[in-house]
């Protein structure tokens, strides 16, 4: 399928509120800040829950990728990264922000005391009668719903069906809105096909408008009859959307 035809098909999708545009559900940066303020960090559980949400957002990892993360998959260095095993059994290395590393170290002191940075233990786990077990997807979803309900008191727009993928979509959209090239966003998300990531470009209407204005500035002298959007070739469309 050509990009020209692809974008014509996208234009048929009706616009909805921001968090539902083009099938993507994501939080605004303000909503994310309210959500991350909900855990009680004076408690051990609150420290764990906050780290889990921060890592879902900072890494953009899928929930199972994060729950499968082991301590030895974290690079504790001046340029910290986490190694996640994604779809197709492919590893990718994701940069982690210094503030996130501070939360990881704080969490490690409480949940992994005495364990070194190369331990093979799962980073997140549940303790049942002294026996550790990997944390389940269901546990995370229940936890997120709890904090979403709490956040809704001061942020009515908080989704009622908050789920782990909201964090992945939100981080990708925020990076794109702040100027990250869509090709880099695609690599960061671990998408095998760049077209999968194009949905973020379609969802952000304001950035799309600015990109079109910028691309049109140099051709304003061309007669209207010489320019037809339906005949733009794939390479031109890719440059228009920041893919070249």
Residue ranges and their predicted role:
Residues 1-244:
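Conserved catalytic core of the tyrosine transesterase superfamily
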């Amino acid at each position: 399928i050509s990009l020209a035809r692809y974008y014509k098909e996208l234009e048929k999708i009706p616009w909805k509120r921001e968090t539902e545009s083009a099938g993507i559900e994501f939080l605004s940066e303000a909503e994310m800040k309210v959500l991350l303020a909900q855990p009680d960090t004076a408690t051990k559980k609150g420290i764990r829950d906050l780290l889990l949400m921060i890592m879902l957002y900072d890494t953009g990892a899928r929930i199972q990728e994060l729950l499968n993360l082991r301590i030895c998959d974290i690079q504790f260095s001046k340029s910290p990264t986490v190694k996640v095993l994604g779809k197709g059994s492919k590893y990718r290395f994701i940069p982690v922000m210094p503030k996130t590393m501070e939360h990881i170290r704080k969490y490690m002191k409480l949940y992994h005391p005495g364990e070194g940075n190369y331990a093979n233990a799962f980073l997140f786990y549940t303790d049942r009668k002294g026996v550790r077990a990997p944390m389940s997807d269901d546990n995370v979803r229940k936890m997120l719903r709890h904090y979403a309900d709490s956040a809704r008191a001061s942020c009515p727009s908080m989704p009622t069906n908050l789920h782990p993928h909201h964090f992945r979509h939100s981080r990708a959209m925020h990076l794109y809105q702040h100027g990250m090239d869509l090709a880099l966003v695609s690599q960061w998300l671990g998408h095998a096909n760049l077209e999968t990531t194009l949905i973020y470009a379609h969802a952000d209407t304001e950035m799309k408008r600015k990109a079109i204005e910028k691309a049109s500035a140099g051709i304003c002298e061309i007669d209207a009859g010489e320019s037809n959007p339906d005949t733009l070739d794939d390479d031109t469309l890719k440059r228009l959307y920041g893919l070249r």
